[in-house]
Structures are given as structure tokens and as C-alpha cells.
């Protein structure tokens, strides 16, 4: 099953050109973006930093929050399955260098452009849906009117 998913992902890279900044087969340290994306497989987040690959398996924005707290994202390359505005703001807060995702929400793109983060994606969607797929993701709802990465980080790390 993993090989089939990896093959499908590879076909997406061949069939759908990278959007925006990344050129096909661009090297990111020791790997191309395609190679890093294939390594993501069933994980939710892959971070390539200082020659090391780290995986996170939690759902939503938790993988980003864990990575920021544990090892940081400064000058890292992140490969995430889905990126909305909340994830984009957290990635900028963590000072990520490059990002690739399969699915990106329209409102995440201006965040990366404003902060000059290199990004690529396979598909753009209007917004990130909640788990029931009947509305906006609650994390996206929290940052709907937020444009500051620092403020977004504070919102998501605030003790309830």
C-alpha cells in the first residue's frame, strides 16, 4: 500500500507542475523536493533541517507546534500534507525556509509571499475543511483575521 501511495504521489509530481517558486528537481540539501515529499508517506509533517529528517504524525497544527518547541524550523524545509493559513503563519513564525504541500488553502499563499518563504503545492483549495467536512477548520477560524505569525503562535500555545 505504501508503495502505491508513493507511486501516486510521484505521478502527481510528474503530472502537475510545481507551482510558484520551486523548479522541478530542485535540490534542497541532499534531496530534491520530490524525494522529500515521497518520504512523507503516511506521516503528517516532514522537516529537513541541518541534514536531518524529522517526522511528526499528529493531526492538524500539532506537528508544527511540536517541531517549533522541540527543534525549531529555522532555515528548514517543511513538507506538509495540507497547509492553511494557520499552518502558514506557524511556519513563518518558526522561520521555515521552504515549504511543499499537496494541498494549500488560498489564504495561506499571501502569508508565504509576504514573508518571502519559498513554497510549492500540487492543488489549491478555497479553504481547509473541518473533520466533518461541513465547514471551516476550527484552527483556520481562529486566525481568520490574524496576520501576525507571532500572534497566531500565541493563540495556539495559550493555556486554556
Label for each model-derived stretch:
Residues 26-102, 122-142:
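Conserved mixed alpha/beta catalytic, RNA-binding, or beta-rich assembly cores of soluble enzyme
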Residues 107-108, 130:
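Short, glycine/polar-rich helix-capping loops at beta-to-alpha or helix-loop-helix junctions
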Residues 17-25:
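Sec-dependent signal peptide cleavage junction
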Residues 29, 46, 144-160:
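Intrinsically disordered, low-complexity, charge-dense segments enriched in Lys/Arg
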Residues 8-16:
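Bacterial N-terminal signal peptides
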Residues 1-4:
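Positively charged n-region of N-terminal signal peptides that target proteins for export
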Residues 108-122:
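Short acidic, glycine/proline-enriched helix-loop-strand junctions
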Amino acid at each position: 500500500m505504501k508503495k502505491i501511495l508513493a507511486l501516486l504521489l510521484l505521478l502527481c509530481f510528474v503530472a502537475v507542475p510545481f507551482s510558484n517558486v520551486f523548479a522541478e528537481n530542485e535540490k534542497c540539501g541532499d534531496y530534491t523536493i520530490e524525494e522529500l515529499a515521497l518520504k512523507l508517506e503516511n506521516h503528517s509533517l516532514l522537516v529537513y533541517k541541518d541534514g536531518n529528517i524529522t517526522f511528526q504524525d499528529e493531526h492538524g497544527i500539532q506537528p508544527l507546534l511540536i517541531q517549533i518547541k522541540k527543534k525549531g524550523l529555522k532555515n528548514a524545509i517543511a513538507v506538509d500534507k495540507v497547509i492553511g493559513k494557520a499552518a502558514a503563519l506557524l511556519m513563518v513564525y518558526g522561520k521555515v525556509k521552504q515549504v511543499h504541500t499537496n494541498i494549500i488553502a488560498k489564504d495561506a499563499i499571501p502569508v508565504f509571499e509576504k514573508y518571502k518563504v519559498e513554497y510549492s503545492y500540487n492543488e489549491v483549495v478555497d479553504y481547509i475543511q473541518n473533520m466533518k467536512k461541513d465547514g471551516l477548520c476550527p484552527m483556520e477560524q481562529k486566525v481568520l483575521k490574524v496576520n501576525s505569525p507571532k500572534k497566531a503562535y500565541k493563540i495556539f500555545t495559550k493555556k486554556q
